[in-house]
């Protein structure tokens, strides 16, 4: 009878350890989910910022091209004079 009680107590202890481990892992999973959501938002924000910078870069290149064309036209007129 004593042997059965010892085995039961050991089993109970192992079950409790398993429950504690599962609880800790569930908490860790929740923390990781929150971190993942934060990182997803940061990535989306960075992508949005990159898209804006690419648009701005494109506009600046167009403006530069326009100024270069005007400058070439002015230099052409100066050579004619």
From Swiss-Prot:
Name recorded for this polypeptide: Cell division protein ZapB
Gene source species: Klebsiella pneumoniae subsp. pneumoniae (strain ATCC 700721 / MGH 78578)
Biased composition (Basic and acidic residues): 48-59
Subcellular location: Cytoplasm
Disulphide-bonded residues: none
Quaternary structure (record): Homodimer. The ends of the coiled-coil dimer bind to each other, forming polymers. Interacts with FtsZ.
Coiled-coil features, chain-numbered ranges: 5-81
Family, per entry: Belongs to the ZapB family.
UniProt keyword terms in alphabetical order: Cell cycle, Cell division, Coiled coil, Cytoplasm, Septation
Any Gene Ontology CC annotation: cytoplasm
Task of the protein: Non-essential, abundant cell division factor that is required for proper Z-ring formation. It is recruited early to the divisome by direct interaction with FtsZ, stimulating Z-ring assembly and thereby promoting cell division earlier in the cell cycle. Its recruitment to the Z-ring requires functional FtsA or ZipA.
GO biological process: division septum assembly; FtsZ-dependent cytokinesis; vesicle-mediated transport
SUPFAM superfamilies: t-snare proteins
Signal sequence, renumbered to the chain: none
Top-level taxonomic group: Bacteria
Residue ranges of the region described as Disordered: 43-64
């Amino acid at each position: 009878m004593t042997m059965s009680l010892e085995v039961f107590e050991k089993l109970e202890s192992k079950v409790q350890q398993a429950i504690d481990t599962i609880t800790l892992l569930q908490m860790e999973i929740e923390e990781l989910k929150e971190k993942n959501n934060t990182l997803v938002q940061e990535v989306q924000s960075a992508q949005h910022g990159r898209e804006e910078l690419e648009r701005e870069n494109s506009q600046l290149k167009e403006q530069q091209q326009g100024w270069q064309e005007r400058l070439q036209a002015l230099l052409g007129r100066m050579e004619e004079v």
